[in-house]
Structures are given as structure tokens and as C-alpha cells.
Amino acid sequence: MGHSDSSKTFRILMAGNPNCGKSTLFNQLTGLRQKTGNYHGVTVEKAEGIFHHLDHSVKILDLPGAFSLGGSSEDKQITSRVLIGHEAGDRILFVMDASLAERSLQFLLQILELNVPVLVAVTMKDVLEKKRVQLRLDLLSNEFGILFQYVNPKNGEGIKELKDRIVSPKAFCLPIRSFPWDSERENFLNDLLNSLSTEHSNSLKFVLTNSLKELSGEILQKGLPGLSLFSETPSKLIREKFERFGKRFTYLEELTQKSIYIKKILSTAIVGDPIPNERVLSKADKILLHPFWGLVSFLGIMALVFQALFTWSEMPMDWIESCVRNVGTFVGDFLEEGPLRSLIQEGIIGGVGAVLVFIPQISLLFLFIGILEETGYIARASFVMDRFMGKFGLSGKSFIPLLSSAACAVPAIMGTRTIENKSDRLTTILVSPLITCSARYPVYVLVIGAIFPSKNILGIFNVQALTMFGLFLLGMIASMFAALVFKKTFFKSDSSYFLMELPAYNTPSIKSLALTVFKKLKAFLSTAGQIILFISILLWFLANYPRIDSSLYPNLTDAELKKIQIRESYAGHSGKFMEPVLKPIGFDWKMGIGIITSFAAREIMVSTLSIIYGVGGEESTDDLKEALLKDTDENGKPVWGLSNSVSLLLFFAFACQCMSTLAVVKKETNSIFWPLFLFTYMTILAYSTSFIVFQVWQLFS
């Protein structure tokens, strides 16, 4: 075995197939010592981390999952570009799925041609054990001349041993052999390699093989280096020798030879008495993958998720409300009555605290989506949804970004990079914001909690939870029909296909889930939190100035004076100015102010209402709900009724009230036109839907 140098500071490139446990292993190795960004010149997320062990400092780069080098999507091109263009001293940690050994070895054989020190971490040992088989890593090590080690990223088994091995000078090895062609082609390749030993020595065999494929009439996958990489003299030499050789190097020949080679290795490396396939396949798949029952199962699972969001979050929400209320009281005891106290209590504590209350529900949402991903269910849902989505011009490949929008549309839109078909990708980007996201939940919970009764149906589902589930379904249906319209008008193209291999069922890693929830919640608070704080302070000023002369209203209570103050403030006059446009959809001037501020971020609607209704840090969300229900217009009629509350929910379901979403659409499409188009069509859709529903409701009520 050829070993790497013993430097105490080096970089590891983590590579592997999708769903092999690579990112979970990355989390186990780096913990919270990681950061995300984008690769230079593209929008693919870059995940980096560091771990320190035995006086070594190891930098790890988690590359996007791929099945081979090359590909048409941005993430696959990045993986290829980083691996092929590796820096001196880099090492590759290849993560291999033991349950899909043949597929993993196909990719590994390509990587071995890059002439980089490699260590292989083998996952899914537990899946093999359930099948009553073993994968002999010693035989694989002897065959390739590199080290293979079992590790379980989900429970941490083998992590310490892997860290020990990573910092060992003998861990990362140069392979003693790579994929062998038949004897004639292999001899020809070796002869050429000896002639070109000074050219591109890092990955010479890989580049040379690609060059011979080009000369054989093959079109290289996007991002792969070929004949153009060589200068004129060696390029001419390769052409001349290839023409004299007379045999072609084709993808079909390579795939055939690789399959024979890998099957021969695994025939001895896989030992045991395997259970028949019928017993290995989960009985659940008979239901979850069924064309009809699979769709019903998906809807049922999502209904249970929304039910849990309401029932499980009640206690932590009450606790956070109590904390916010106590902080408001504490601050109020130290400050004298006046503008500063009002700013801190009503503007900062009241505004920001009104949104913080909903963190338990948002955290639960991130947790449930993480569980569905790690168990392998999301892949099965994609398979089931492929046929359904095909009727609307999309493939199952668009399903994962769409479902990811239930957490946040920003990473979901970034996730469309895996969609090779450009029209499918752009369509998915434009319809993803229609899916109910976590930023809408504070508004939904507030309005639904105030207007809809909290009673059970069938003894299981809460009416409020079912209402929120209905809004989620509405977003899914709207996105499908919007996709159909776009595919029939703007993005006419051939239908794309969806090819996937279902991952095995897995037990979620508690540590990985905790890290996922933590990172997403941190991102939510760091981005939305800053906007909420700024808007809350600005809105407090607009709602409290210019100050009214209270001596003009000697017989009014403080609550009545506060109403007049807001009505006569800058915010009040702005709301009154917009009221003629908003009245046809059932909104008064207070709702109008909330609508305008929420275009910065949807959750600001709650902060806005909290400030406008004067619910400060000493009150709770229940007080805000009560304030909404008690609010009346000039005629003494309730401002918040069922008709305009439904109208408001529909407006939030369809409007694009998120600056971050518009920014990421511009970044992903590299055009200002598409975010403007997205904002325009969603705003028109939101207003027209609310208008129709409210006016029809008024007509028949």
C-alpha cells in the first residue's frame, strides 16, 4: 500500500453515493464545528467542518452525493470538479453503503483512478446483518490496496476508531490497482501512460481514458476532462497510437467490464446465508409504494404531523409565553412610564416575543421532516408522487424540493439544482413558494387559534390542526396547477424521467436529527430574527408618533387612548390610505399594516398585530388572540370574523411575502425577471383568491 504523508493539518474530501450516510458521518465527525456557504461561481451549498484529534487538525469538505464523476446538474459537476482538481495533500474519505456495495464500488473505481490517497468508511452494516450476510472488508482491502472500515454514523459506533485511523499516517493509501480493462486495452493504456508520465500526473489515467472514449466517438459527461486537456504534442501522440491500436473505448464496454470485475470481487467478499428478497423487503412498502394507498398514506402521515404540531407544542409554547411575559414585567418594574419603556416592552419584547412563542412548532416541523428523510420515507413518497406529478408536467425529482418548502422555500429552491431538466427546474423554483412554509405558521396558528374552535373530530384530529393541514394541501394543489400552467405555456419541453433506487429503511440518528433541527432553527432565527427586530422597532415608532395630546380626551381609559394614538399615528394614516384597496378582500387598516410589513418576512405579521393592538411584553399570545376577537369597527361589528379570517389565511397561503425567497430566486436563475414574475403572479393570485372567497361569502351570508 502507498501511504500518504504524516502532516498534522490536512483536508479530507468526503465523497459517496446519495443516501449512503455521508452527511450523517460528517455531522458525527465535526459536530457543531462546521459552516456552510456556496462554491465559487455557482449556487451549490458548500459544507465544511473541522475536527481536532490527537494533535491533528483535520478540515473536511462534504461533497454533494453522486453516483459517478460527471453529470449535468450543478451539484454533480461540483463533486467532479473538486475531486478531479484536488489540491496537493488532499485525501479522500469515500463513504460506501455496504447494502448497495456494487453501486458504491462503481463510483469508487473511478475515484481510484485519480491517484489520491483514499480511506473507505463502510456504512449500513446493520442492514447487511438483517439480511444475514457479511461483507469481508479484508478481501476488499487486499484487492484494492486501500483500507476499509465499518462505521455506524447513526449511533456513533466506530466513530472514535475512524478518527484514530484518519490521523494515522498509514490510513489513507494510494491504490495498488484501479479498474482493469481487458488485457489488450490495459496493456495499451499502460504503454500510453508511460509515454505521458509528465502530463497531468495527478489523474493521468482518468483523463487518458476519457480522451480515448472521445476518440471512440463517445460524448463525455459534462464536467469531465478529456483530450482538450493535453497540449498539442501529447494529443497528437494519443491520436496516432489510438488509430494504430484499432479498438474502441466505450461507456458500454467499460460498464460491462466493471460489472464483471465487481461481481467477481463481491462473489467472494459477501458471505453468509441471505434471506430471500421477499422477506427482506419491508411489508410496509406494499402499502407505501402502492399507486393509491401510497398517496393516502402520505396524506395521512402529513395530517398526523400537523396534529402533532398543535398538540405537542402547547406546553413549550406556554412556557415561552410565560418567559416573555416575565421579562416584560421585569423590565417594566425598572423603567419609568414613558417612550423608552413602551419601546422595550411593546416594540422589542412584544414584537420579537410574539414570534419566539412559535419556535416549538417550527422546531417540531424541522424534526418531523428530518425523521421522514432519515427513515427513507421521503424517497418512497417521491416514487409514489412521480405518477401523480407527471399529470402536471413534473417528475418525482421535483417532489423533494417541494416538500422541503414545508420547512423553508429558500433551501428548497437551492435544492432544485439536482434537477437536470432546465424547464422542470425553473418550474419547480416558481411553484415552491406556494407550499406552506414555517414562516407562515405563526400567522396560521394565531388566526386559526383565535377563530376556529378547538374540538376533536373522530376523537383523533383537532379542528385547528385539520385547518392547518388543509392549508398545506391547498399549497400543494396550487403548486401542481401552477406547474401545469407554466409547462403548457412558458416551459414547453420533453417530459423528463425519474430514475431512483429506494434506500433501505433506517433508524434515525438522534444526534444527526438534533444537529439538523439546531442548524435550521439557528438559520431561521438569525435571518428572520434580525428582520423582525428591525421592523418591530420601526413599527413601534410609526405606531406611537406623532403623539396625541391626551388632555383632549379627559374621560377615556388608557386602552381607549392607545387605540386613538395608533389610529392617528403614521402607521394608522398609512393603513387608512391602503384601506380602499384592502376592503374588498375583507381587511381593515390594521390588517393592511400587517400585510405590508409581512412582505419583508411573513412572521412579522404577528409582531405587527402585537404592536398595533398594544399587546406588549407583559401579555401573552392568548391576550393577542383575545384582542383580535374584541376588536370592533365604527359600527360595533367584530373586525375579525370567519369570512375575513379565511380571506387572510388564503392571502398568506398564496402571496410571496419573503425577501429571502426573492433573493435566492434571483441568485438561482441569474435573472431579475423571474423574482419579479414570481412576486407578481403570486400577489395577483393571493388578492384574486381572497377577493372571490370574501365577496362570495358576503353574498351568501
Swiss-Prot record:
Transmembrane stretches, start-end: 292-312, 352-372, 394-414, 429-451, 466-486, 523-543, 645-665, 672-692
PROSITE patterns associated with the record: G_FEOB (PS51711)
Subcellular location: Cell inner membrane
Alphabetical keyword list: Cell inner membrane, Cell membrane, GTP-binding, Ion transport, Iron, Iron transport, Membrane, Nucleotide-binding, Transmembrane, Transmembrane helix, Transport
Membership in a protein family: Belongs to the TRAFAC class TrmE-Era-EngA-EngB-Septin-like GTPase superfamily. FeoB GTPase (TC 9.A.8) family.
First-listed, main subcellular location of the protein, grouped into a coarse class: membrane
Topology class, membrane: Multi-pass membrane protein
Binding site for GTP: 16-23, 41-46, 62-65
Protein name (database record): Fe(2+) transporter FeoB
PANTHER family associated with the record: FE(2+) TRANSPORTER FEOB, FERROUS IRON TRANSPORT PROTEIN B
Domain of life, per lineage: Bacteria
Lineage: Bacteria, Pseudomonadati, Spirochaetota, Spirochaetia, Leptospirales
SUPFAM superfamilies hit by this protein: P-loop containing nucleoside triphosphate hydrolases
MF terms (GO), sorted A to Z: ferrous iron transmembrane transporter activity; GTP binding
GO annotations of cellular component type: plasma membrane
InterPro entries for the chain: Fe2_transport_prot-B, Fe2_transport_prot_B_C, FeoB_GTPase, G_FEOB_dom, Gate_dom, GTP-bd, P-loop_NTPase
Protein purpose: Probable transporter of a GTP-driven Fe(2+) uptake system.
FeoB-type G domain: residues covered: 9-172
